[in-house]
Amino acid sequence: MFVYVNTPLVVMIWQNYDDNLFIRLGQYLASGHWLGPYSQFTLMKGPGYPAFLAANYWSGLPITFTQGLFCCLALAALSLVTFRATRSRLVALAIFVVPLLDPRVFEVSRVLRDCIYFSQSILIIAVVSYCLFLSNGIRTRLISAIIAGALFGWFWLTREEGVWLLPAITVLGLFALLRKKRYSEACKILPPALIGTGAFVLVLVLFATINFFIYGMFIGVDFKERNFQAALSAMESVQIAKPIPYVNVPRAARAQIYAISPHFAELRPYLDPNPGPSPWEAGDCLHRPTACGDIGNGFFIWAVRDAAAKVGVYKSPKDASRFYKAISKEIRSACTKRQLRCVKNFVPYMPRMTRSQIEQIPRSAIELLRDMVHPGMYSKFADGHVTGPKDEFRSALDFLNYPLHYPISNSHFTAVAIRGWYHDPKIGDQWFSVTVSDKGDKALPFTLIRIASPDLVESQHDENATQQRFSLRTQCGAGCVLHFASADGGTRDVAISSSTALTAQYLPIGSGLLVFDSGAVENEATVYDDGRVRLASRIRAVLYPIFEILLPVLLGLGTLSFFGGCYMAVRKRNYPIILAVAAACWVSVLTRSVILVLIDVSSFPAMITPYLLPIYVLSVVASILSLSVMRKRWTFVDQTGTATQTSDTSCVDG
């Protein structure tokens, strides 16, 4: 918790499709205005994380503390299940502590849904396991089923690819059936399964129902809306002579679609402006060279939505749905009439791949495996990228309850106050001019006051030097410089560093003399000066080499132990709870890995920490559980919690 809370947050308020979107939706929820006025952004992504942000705002706790606490609670729940199943305090403690020490958990220091997504997956596996294996009595079992279903509904509305956790839940159900000796006992699993499913469906129906009353359409996340997906599928089905990797709807295909689809042609000024390139063309170019000069798969969906919003499509969900339905219908009709050459894509939600992309699957899988085993070295986030309007930045910080954060790049955290005098005997009482600048602004505001100077009349023997003293005050940020200019064209720049550098300074400017009698530079304390942040950074730096050694051993032995445990379980027909939970975790790792590899080779780079976090944590948990299964002497625990020792290598039975 200390490291999590004291890892500064990077508040990217310019990220309208991620960080700022979640903050804005959360602010609407917290103020009681649902998800706000309808636009292309309103239902673009699920409200799971904005709801968490809203709840955090009401709690008054910094968002980093709440997210860290949620991670601890999820691991504590799984640790409790582990203890109930094994009666081993050591294994339960390892389940709680080792994932928390994984330095990769702290890498996502942004306002992203991925910060809670891995915790949600752990908590769901823990609650489902408790419901199926450890709950005593019908009432407890049904309540835990409702909680599990509601959690899965929340999980489903947090990211769009929640299907990857379904196989893990199925595995837990299969183990529960295998552990039942009689048909009548197996039937007892059905009621909680149905109730949990009902709670899951109820969450989704409730979300769509509220959208119906607020926005006029029974709809969930409109990214998955039927007509929107049909339109995308229709666009991607249009073929050109030579397919371009990572560009399923290239400019040549768009030109053909414009010709036969009046509705899609409305988007042409924004997708393919004339003259000039589309602003979306640069998005995929850095990582996908074949996409340079065109709109790559990773950005095409957002480009279409953005263009549709600019032509007024997103007045309501119904208007947007009708628009995309018309595009789909026009393209399908042209395909049927052979006006377009089309090939149907039979894999929903996944762009079509060329042969060269398919050949990249092994490379992507190896990269994922390498990232799992080797955490790399500690690298500080590029905090200098925090930019945006200051009022929005302050509003976001207030909503997030002021966590430790990197300051905005154009923050004025240096206060400068100078007192002195200026005299030029050649020009009498004429005055100098001054401007103030820093890295973010070339013309900062300042206050310059002329003060009576009878002492200078006498000391300089100039009867015109009656108002030559001054007081100068300003605020600036990094790279602060004072630019002085005299009436005769002389200039002098003074870089602000410390009060000492401004005191008793004599600066010739042209034919005049500028004197600083005293100067004060007060730097507002920032995250860079916080000892807690420096300590947390050192702890993270120490953890990376430790896990660089630990992970290959832990994951390697964990994998072998899992297969050994499965072999023993099948041979003895004894299916312990701990093996069931380990299997669920390993299956989750596998299914999410498959999804990320397919995304990586078909669309945008997916081997990044935010997407990989569930794999990182679940693989560590699965390895620890698998190792506990293969102990020399197995603890045999019955449903009542009584533990006995066996002389052979039997499996743990909860």
Where are these regions (language model features)?
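Extracytoplasmic catalytic/substrate-binding loops of multi-pass membrane glycan-assembly enzymes
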Residues: 8-25, 34-52
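Transmembrane-helix signature of polytopic, membrane-embedded enzymes
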Residues: 76-103, 119, 138-143
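Transmembrane-helix motifs of polytopic, lipid-linked glycan transferases
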Residues: 62-87, 123-127
